[in-house]
């Protein structure tokens, strides 16, 4: 059956549109069931993240793509003309290629981002839970996960951070070989600090302290991550606990000065402290780098790392694209092989039916007292005539049409030339 993809992502639509077509996790199975029960698709998987909503479907024919787009608009209450201007579609090989690129991080806002593979796997699992996936998409997604794993394993696509937040956490991991026993003090509660916090949590940080000018905002983030919230004015009392300090506020004046860091390192008995200032203007006085056992990095230091890593990821992406093309070819072979398998099964079933019919005639002949020799003769002739009927008709039609290619194929299939040689 044909495969189609209908999607909207960060390249085609602003967040104001993307949020309107997003699917709530708790309603995903109902949405999938609706899509299938309304006969828009036979199988479906929906990937819905902050940057994309994509519907992967196995359908009766490619004309169903219009039905799927119409269903998406109806489900979310968006007029079809408005929705269509933001949608993109793929079919068959292009659909296979697209899902493999998505799962491998090649279609992401941040090239090579690792989270998307987990999100695609979760979408697949939800579809399985709702019994909305069958042999077509099962095969596609298993092949996709295999290709994405190979891309992750055999290229450097995910080894080099390309966001400020990810770069900051990666730097911390380089300096502290194991951050699972470390405490991080995060100053600010904006999007960048939120991403930093999530990256730290994903990498097993022991404890996070969130400091913000507004305690309520810090508490919201702290509650999400099982962290501790404090006011900016309390930083001096907590700084000595921090192995890692990452700051990103909108303050026009430095929040951490040299003297504060000197007192903290003294209380820490000169255990190393990493400070990463990703604010503009700076949150941490430049003189802090003069303090023994304090290691200060700025946003410019991270940008240089990111630029190098973007280039490295682009090189890795070239190798990844080749792996994806190999994956598309491999999947195509599986599909074609499945078609041949179905044909073989049908052919064998036809032969089995002929055998049973002729065998039944033979048994009746024996019951009626016919000699075994006579029965076997009729059985052999009956089998021969029925088995060669369709090939004989094909050969006559090909001969009448002077279709030499068909005659050559038929002779190879029937083994006629081999018989002459033997």
Curated annotation (Swiss-Prot):
Protein residues bound to substrate: 49-52, 108, 113-115, 119
Site entry: Important for activity: 98
Other noteworthy facts: During catalysis, the active site Cys acts as a nucleophile attacking the alpha-carbonyl group of tRNA-bound glutamate with the formation of a thioester intermediate between enzyme and glutamate, and the concomitant release of tRNA(Glu). The thioester intermediate is finally reduced by direct hydride transfer from NADPH, to form the product GSA.
PANTHER family in the cross-refs: GLUTAMYL-TRNA REDUCTASE
Keyword NADP carried by entry: yes
Major enzyme class: oxidoreductase
Protein known as: Glutamyl-tRNA reductase
Entries under InterPro entries matching the protein: 4pyrrol_synth_GluRdtase, 4pyrrol_synth_GluRdtase_dimer, 4pyrrol_synth_GluRdtase_N, GluRdtase_CS, GluRdtase_dimer_dom_sf, GluRdtase_N_sf, NAD(P)-bd_dom_sf, Shikm_DH/Glu-tRNA_Rdtase
Enzyme Commission number(s): 1.2.1.70
Pathway: Porphyrin-containing compound metabolism; protoporphyrin-IX biosynthesis; 5-aminolevulinate from L-glutamyl-tRNA(Glu): step 1/2
Family: Belongs to the glutamyl-tRNA reductase family.
UniProt keywords, alphabetically: NADP, Oxidoreductase, Porphyrin biosynthesis
Role noted for this protein: Catalyzes the NADPH-dependent reduction of glutamyl-tRNA(Glu) to glutamate 1-semialdehyde (GSA).
Catalytic activity as recorded in UniProt: (S)-4-amino-5-oxopentanoate + tRNA(Glu) + NADP(+) = L-glutamyl-tRNA(Glu) + NADPH + H(+)
BP term (GO), one: protoporphyrinogen IX biosynthetic process from glutamate
Domain observations: Possesses an unusual extended V-shaped dimeric structure with each monomer consisting of three distinct domains arranged along a curved 'spinal' alpha-helix. The N-terminal catalytic domain specifically recognizes the glutamate moiety of the substrate. The second domain is the NADPH-binding domain, and the third C-terminal domain is responsible for dimerization.
């Amino acid at each position: 059956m044909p495969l189609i993809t209908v999607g909207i992502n960060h390249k085609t639509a602003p967040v104001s549109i993307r949020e309107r077509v997003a699917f709530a996790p708790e309603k995903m199975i109902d949405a999938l069931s609706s899509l299938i029960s309304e006969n828009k698709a036979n199988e479906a998987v929906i990937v819905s993240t902050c940057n994309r909503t994509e519907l992967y479907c196995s359908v009766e024919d490619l004309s169903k793509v219009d039905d799927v787009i119409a269903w998406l608009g109806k489900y979310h209450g968006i007029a079809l003309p408005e929705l269509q201007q933001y949608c993109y579609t793929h079919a068959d090989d292009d659909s296979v290629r697209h899902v493999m690129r998505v799962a491998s991080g090649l279609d992401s806002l941040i090239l090579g981002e690792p989270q998307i593979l987990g999100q695609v796997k979760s979408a697949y699992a939800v579809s399985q839970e709702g019994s909305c996936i069958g042999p077509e998409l099962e095969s596609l997604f298993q092949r996709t996960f295999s290709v994405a794993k190979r891309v992750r394993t055999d290229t450097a696509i995910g080894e080099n951070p390309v966001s400020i937040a990810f770069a900051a956490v990666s730097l911390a991991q380089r300096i502290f070989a194991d951050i699972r026993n470390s405490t991080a003090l995060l100053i600010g509660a904006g999007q960048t600090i939120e991403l930093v916090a999530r990256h730290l949590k994903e990498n097993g940080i022991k404890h996070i302290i969130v400091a913000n000018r507004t305690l309520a905002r810090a508490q919201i983030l702290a509650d999400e991550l099982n962290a501790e919230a404090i006011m900016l004015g309390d930083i001096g009392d907590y700084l000595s606990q921090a192995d890692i300090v990452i700051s990103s506020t909108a303050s026009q004046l430095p929040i951490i000065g040299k003297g504060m860091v000197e007192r903290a390192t003294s209380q820490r008995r000169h255990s190393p402290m990493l400070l990463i200032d990703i604010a503009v203007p700076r949150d941490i006085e430049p003189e802090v780098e003069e303090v023994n056992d304090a290691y200060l990095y700025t946003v410019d230091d991270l940008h240089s790392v990111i630029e190098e890593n973007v280039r490295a990821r682009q090189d890795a992406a070239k190798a990844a694209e080749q792996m994806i093309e190999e994956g598309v070819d491999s999947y195509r072979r599986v599909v074609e092989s499945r078609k041949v398998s179905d044909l073989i099964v049908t052919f064998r079933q036809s032969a089995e039916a002929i055998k049973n019919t002729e065998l039944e005639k033979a048994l009746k002949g024996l019951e009626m007292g016919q000699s075994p020799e006579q029965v076997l003769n009729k059985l052999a002739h009956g089998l021969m005539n029925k088995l060669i009927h369709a090939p004989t008709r094909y050969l006559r039609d090909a001969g009448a049409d002077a279709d030499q290619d068909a005659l050559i194929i038929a002779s190879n299939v029937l083994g006629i030339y081999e018989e002459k040689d033997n």
